[in-house]
């Protein structure tokens, strides 16, 4: 019989690990993240190993709410991106739902420009195209001379509402 005992990575091997203490994280990423005050974000989960749909939706909403002040602090302290304008348009979705488009473009944009269609992060369950980290990224990209269309889509949970797949 073998005495082999696997060493599991991450929380499987050490349930006390956090994002900051996990030895697998690239030190450069850890250094960059150090400015985000991750101590402000709750790291423990109250979810069981088999949560109900309602518990999952509530958990996602709580996660989103706990991260918002971190992003607001980080990106709210940056100077505005100059030479960029923003406007909002609403289009009709296939279900008759309204879809907000936030259009970021160079202030001097009366000419054909390259563009990108950008969807925000959050795994299609939380966050918003108007969150400061996504607005900043779109402004930075627009400042390089392109049009950026940030799409606000229905999430599976969080502040934009509970819209189960396929929303």
Locations of the language-model features?
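A glycine/proline-hinged amphipathic helix-loop "lid/cap" segment
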Residues: 1-98, 103
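Short strand-connecting beta-turns/loops that link adjacent beta-strands
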Residues: 96, 108-110
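Short beta-strand element of the alpha/beta-hydrolase
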Residues: 101, 111-123
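Short, low-complexity Ser/Thr-rich regulatory SLiMs
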Residues: 103-108, 155
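Catalytic nucleophile-loop/oxyanion-hole region of alpha/beta-hydrolase
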Residues: 128-129, 133, 137, 149-167
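A fold-wide structural signal in alpha/beta-hydrolase
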Residues: 142-149
């Amino acid at each position: 019989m073998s005495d082999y005992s696997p060493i599991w990575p991450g929380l499987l091997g050490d349930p006390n690990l956090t994002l900051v203490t996990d030895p697998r994280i690239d030190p450069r990423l850890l250094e960059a993240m150090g400015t985000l005050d991750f101590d402000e974000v709750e790291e423990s989960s109250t979810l069981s190993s088999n949560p109900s749909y309602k518990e999952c939706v509530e958990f996602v909403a709580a996660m989103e709410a706990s991260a918002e002040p971190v992003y607001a602090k980080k990106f709210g302290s940056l100077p505005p991106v100059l030479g960029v304008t923003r406007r909002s348009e609403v289009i009709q979705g296939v279900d008759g739902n309204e879809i907000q488009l936030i259009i970021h473009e160079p202030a001097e944009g009366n000419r054909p420009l390259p563009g990108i269609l950008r969807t925000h992060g959050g795994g299609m369950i939380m966050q918003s195209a108007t969150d400061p980290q996504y607005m900043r990224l779109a402004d930075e990209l627009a400042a390089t001379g392109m049009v950026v269309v940030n799409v606000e889509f229905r999430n599976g949970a969080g502040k934009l509402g509970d819209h189960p797949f396929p929303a």
